[in-house]
Amino acid sequence: MSLLEAFAEILEPADVHVAQRLTVLADEPDASVELAVALAVRALRGGSVCVDLRSVAGQVELPDLPWPDPDAWLAALAASPLLGQPPVLRLFGDLLYLDRYWLEEQQVCDDVLALVSARPGGAVPDVSRLFGAGFEEQRAAAKVALSQGLTVLTGGPGTGKTTTVARLLALLAEQAALAGKPSPRIALAAPTGKAAARLQEAVQLEIDQLDLIERRRLTGLHATTLHRLLGPRPDTSSRFRHHRANRLPHDVIVVDETSMVSLTMMARLLEAVRPQTRLVLVGDPDQLASVEAGAVLADLVEGLGSRGVAELKTSHRFGESIGALASAIRTGDADAALAVLAAGGEHIEWVHEDPVEQLREVVVPHAMRLRQAAILGDQREALATLDEHRLLCAHRRGPAGVDHWNRQVQRWLGEETGEPLWGSWYVGRPILVTANDYGLKLYNGDTGVVVATPDGMRAVIGDAGTFATGRLTDVETMHAMTIHKSQGSQADEVTVLLPSEDSRLLTRELFYTAVTRAKTRVRVVGAEAEVRAAIERQAVRATGLRKRLRPAGV
């Protein structure tokens, strides 16, 4: 049996194919090098940008596999022609990369450090004017952002990130006015359409509370997706119109929900930012990382530390119990989280026995209200109703998965109305866009509802408008959605379906992300063992960015 065959339990055919192809092309005979290549490809599927050859055996938790000795393994790789010129693989300490991801990580590091060290200069406005008593954390964050080119603004839900951003923009506009310059060109962006819409709404609400002179300086702000900001190209999905040779024209760029931004997307953003631009990256590093490879926000927080990170710690939004639950999950205190769940109350419900009937009592009335608004053709009411409740699942398939619960809710709707839903399109169908469509200006993560109109069924999708259903191909039903897809959005009430405790997706970050999607009420469906498993298991992504960012010797 070959070494790759011995690892068949953890490798996919694609991992093996790439490893075999590369080693043959490089005339590399060492089986341990071939295994390392396969593991590097496998790592990308799991969200890592590299594989840590000293710790991978412990992370896989299959000690009986014939793991190579780490020192001999690293020595074999260092001598491999695959690390020659041009390199196919790269080593960074114990970390093995495919060349592309090594280059992207180094580029992100270089660009971040250049922006952090940039000192824009100019008169500094009176920060305390907009950040008075009770805003000490936000005031400190604004001072950091006014003093350098890049700021990472972190905090959980309700800690005042949006307030800080809006008032920081007012201060930057004031700074420009003091220097006799026009108001800065400002871009607001987020990874998804839903997150961008939330960002624009929240920032505008804060700006509307400022004095008239500030409001005039900040007119016309419009949030967009990162893809739209960078300018999609029809010939490629990984490169954009704006890049190092054609930079973005903005003086200030704010990116929200940065935890969702992959390493590759961050590289594309940073190479398009002018050296004199202020870049503010906003997010919650305790949430799920991007679907694609990387853990950029968490790496920036750990790697930059006090050099570029401003953390907001005090939450002002949640009902006390939701905040307490989120805090217990974030800090890994399973006993405290279970105590909050057991106490229940107005904002918390814990369903830890057969949930089917209880879920029916929740999801069917919501689906019926959505259907009623859609039948009446009330687009605004339909979209508002859509955001009243979310049913969130960890998995797509299986008894606790999105596919199962979408079918179940549709069956219940058919029973309730006496009209079985035979077709894929129906009035009242909640939909989720699953891929970017640059022609229609629809983006992955946009949500909407199918409504009745005099011209037949139309899909109303956020701020993008209405569309004939026949024009939409990359959409799916959204009576339930995955927790990953819910990032960047919120609902008044959220129901979280935890998978079985042995699910590899069940992690602290997943649970925390799900709970913090709720504005006013969260319902957790799962046994005590599943709650404990979620809180005690942290997602591990292998990256080298935080190490690269740290000062030498730290």
UniProtKB/Swiss-Prot annotation:
Family annotation (InterPro entries): Coronavir_polyprotein_1ab, P-loop_NTPase, RecD, RecD_N, RecD_N_sf, UvrD-like_helicase_C
Role of this protein: A helicase/nuclease that prepares dsDNA breaks (DSB) for recombinational DNA repair. Binds to DSBs and unwinds DNA via a highly rapid and processive ATP-dependent bidirectional helicase activity. Holoenzyme degrades any linearized DNA that is unable to undergo homologous recombination. In the holoenzyme this subunit has ssDNA-dependent ATPase and 5'-3' helicase activity. When added to pre-assembled RecBC greatly stimulates nuclease activity and augments holoenzyme processivity.
Pfam families per the UniProt record, alphabetical: AAA_30 (PF13604), RecD_N (PF21185), UvrD_C_2 (PF13538)
Further comment found in the protein's record: In the RecBCD complex, RecB has a slow 3'-5' helicase, an exonuclease activity and loads RecA onto ssDNA, RecD has a fast 5'-3' helicase activity, while RecC stimulates the ATPase and processivity of the RecB helicase and contributes to recognition of the Chi site.
Any GO MF annotation of the entry: 5'-3' DNA helicase activity
Gene inactivation effect: Unlike E.coli, triple recB-recC-recD deletion is no more sensitive to DNA damaging agents (UV light sensitivity, mitomycin C, methyl methanesulphonate or ionizing radiation) than wild-type; has reduced resistance to H(2)O(2) which is exacerbated by further adnA-adnB deletion. Triple mutants have no effect on homologous recombination or on NHEJ of blunt-end, 5'- or 3'-overhang DSBs or on incompatible 3'-chromosomal overhangs. However the triple mutant disrupts all single-strand annealing repair of DSB.
Residues holding ATP: 155-162
Entry GO CC: exodeoxyribonuclease V complex
Source organism of the structure: Mycolicibacterium smegmatis (strain ATCC 700084 / mc(2)155) (Mycobacterium smegmatis)
Gene3D superfamilies (UniProt xref): P-loop containing nucleotide triphosphate hydrolases (3.40.50.300), RecBCD complex, subunit RecD, N-terminal domain (1.10.10.1020)
Quaternary structure and partners: Heterotrimer of RecB, RecC and RecD. All subunits contribute to DNA-binding.
Keywords: ATP-binding, DNA damage, DNA repair, DNA-binding, Exonuclease, Helicase, Hydrolase, Isomerase, Nuclease, Nucleotide-binding
Reaction catalysed by this enzyme: Couples ATP hydrolysis with the unwinding of duplex DNA at the replication fork by translocating in the 5'-3' direction. This creates two antiparallel DNA single strands (ssDNA). The leading ssDNA polymer is the template for DNA polymerase III holoenzyme which synthesizes a continuous strand; ATP + H2O = ADP + phosphate + H(+)
Membrane-crossing segments per the record: none
NCBIfam families on file: recD
Enzyme Commission designation: 5.6.2.3
Name of the protein: RecBCD enzyme subunit RecD
SUPFAM superfamilies: P-loop containing nucleoside triphosphate hydrolases
Transit peptide in keyword set: no
Highest taxon of source: Bacteria
Keyword DNA-binding: yes
Family recorded in the similarity comment: Belongs to the RecD family.
GO biological-process terms attached to the record: double-strand break repair via homologous recombination
